[in-house]
């Protein structure tokens, strides 16, 4: 009798995606982060659902409702901090996942890469709106500053900002719509994830050597399910350590003060995972220029397949590209550090230099080195 997982219409899809999926035998632990992102998404949806049961999206009671969750709801503090720190682990896995895609040339799988960029933008939008919900000082002023950037768009900018706000400033309508969008977006992200996987399974995974593995593949289960389970354990260890020992390590103390439109915090900054983009935004003195640089800093990923004419789908045998990749990583870490510093010398100059280096590396230097390496390899 044929196994039910191979005949049942629904089980067949799960079987071909997670059990009998032909997988390259040599993919490293860096390929674990896709499944870890799935785990992070599941954690965020479950904890978020329980938080939504007790949260009220109203400017007068939002802050109090979060306090109520932490003090009065059974394990409310754990759910709240798992959700907040879960976002940080989500972005950590996301950045490593994108970095692995760049290092091992996964951007050559165009459909998968483009859906991945859509996923990245959706997760960033969700995280931004989630940060507004506790209605603390940094929530309110972060929402004001970031939404206000749209006013830089010529002609329609101011109307667009007021349309998003639902009034003439960030207030109750803004909070209500942000909560509605924050609730629905993770389910859209789940749908996009399935499309992402669908396109990935059309072409098959890349591997560290960048060569075709069609001649030698192994089933996903039990080999990679076992390997991924170690990743899950380490992820849970990190998340639990953050939640139980250092719950406020990555948060902002200002967010424990209720939102006050009459009192601006001395230094408005987003969560750590947006600091690199925030540093790029601040390093350009012109408002419209800053907004364009901010958007381009993420959307530049979409043009990488056009910029880098790789003949080998990996950097493993291209030492010059490897060197530049790690300079890019160091540059992004520098931008993250600068984004959290006040707007004064020497941070302004360092931020400007790091921003110039970021765009130069991705648009000019790395593609040039790529061409040189192709020539050296006689390709």
From Swiss-Prot:
Binds 2 heme b groups non-covalently. One of its GO terms (cellular component) is mitochondrial inner membrane. The keyword Chloroplast does not apply. The keyword Membrane applies. The cytochrome bc1 complex contains 11 subunits: 3 respiratory subunits (MT-CYB, CYC1 and UQCRFS1), 2 core proteins (UQCRC1 and UQCRC2) and 6 low-molecular weight proteins (UQCRH/QCR6, UQCRB/QCR7, UQCRQ/QCR8, UQCR10/QCR9, UQCR11/QCR10 and a cleavage product of UQCRFS1). This cytochrome bc1 complex then forms a dimer. The chain crosses the membrane at residues 33-53, 77-98, 113-133, 178-198, 226-246, 288-308, 320-340, 347-367. GO terms for biological process: mitochondrial electron transport, ubiquinol to cytochrome c. Its cofactor is heme b. Heme b b566 binds at residues 97, 196. It comes from Lepilemur leucopus. Heme 1 (or BL or b562) is low-potential and absorbs at about 562 nm, and heme 2 (or BH or b566) is high-potential and absorbs at about 566 nm. This is Cytochrome b. Heme b b562 binds at residues 83, 182. It is a multi-pass membrane protein. It is found in: Mitochondrion inner membrane. Its main location: mitochondrion. GO terms for molecular function: metal ion binding; ubiquinol-cytochrome-c reductase activity.
């Amino acid at each position: 009798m044929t196994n039910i997982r191979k005949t049942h219409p629904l089980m067949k899809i799960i079987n071909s995606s997670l059990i009998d999926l032909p997988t390259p035998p040599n993919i490293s632990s860096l390929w674990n982060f896709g499944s870890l992102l799935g785990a992070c998404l599941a954690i965020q949806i479950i904890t978020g659902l329980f938080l939504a049961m007790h949260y009220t999206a109203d400017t007068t009671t939002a802050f109090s409702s979060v306090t109520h969750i932490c003090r009065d709801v059974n394990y409310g503090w754990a759910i709240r901090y798992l959700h907040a720190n879960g976002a940080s682990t989500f972005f950590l896995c996301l950045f490593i996942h994108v970095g692995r895609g760049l290092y091992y040339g996964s951007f050559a799988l165009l459909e998968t890469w483009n859906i991945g960029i859509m996923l990245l933008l959706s997760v960033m939008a969700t995280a931004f709106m989630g940060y507004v919900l506790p209605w603390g000082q940094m929530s309110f002023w972060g929402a004001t500053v970031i939404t206000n950037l749209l006013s830089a768009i010529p002609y329609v900018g101011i109307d667009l900002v007021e349309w998003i706000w639902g009034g003439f400033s960030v207030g109750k309508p803004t909070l209500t719509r942000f909560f509605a969008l924050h609730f629905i977006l993770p389910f859209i992200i789940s749908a996009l994830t399935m499309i992402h996987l669908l396109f990935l399974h059309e072409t098959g995974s890349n591997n560290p050597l960048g060569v075709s593995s069609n001649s030698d593949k192994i089933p996903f289960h039990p080999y990679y399910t076992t390997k991924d389970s170690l990743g899950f354990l380490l992820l849970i260890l990190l998340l639990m350590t953050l939640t139980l020992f250092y719950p406020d390590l990555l948060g902002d103390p200002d967010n424990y003060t209720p939102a006050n439109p009459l009192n601006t915090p001395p230094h408005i900054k987003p969560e750590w995972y947006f600091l690199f983009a925030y540093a790029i935004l601040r390093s350009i003195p012109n408002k419209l220029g800053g907004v364009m640089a901010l958007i381009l800093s993420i959307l530049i990923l979409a043009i990488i397949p056009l910029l880098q004419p790789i003949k080998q789908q990996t950097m493993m045998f291209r030492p010059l590209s490897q060197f530049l990749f790690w300079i890019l990583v160091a540059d992004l870490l520098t931008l993250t550090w600068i984004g959290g510093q006040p707007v004064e010398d020497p941070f302004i100059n360092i931020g400007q230099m790091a921003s110039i280096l970021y765009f130069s590396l991705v648009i000019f230097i790395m593609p040039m080195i790529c061409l040189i390496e192709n020539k050296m390899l006689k390709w």
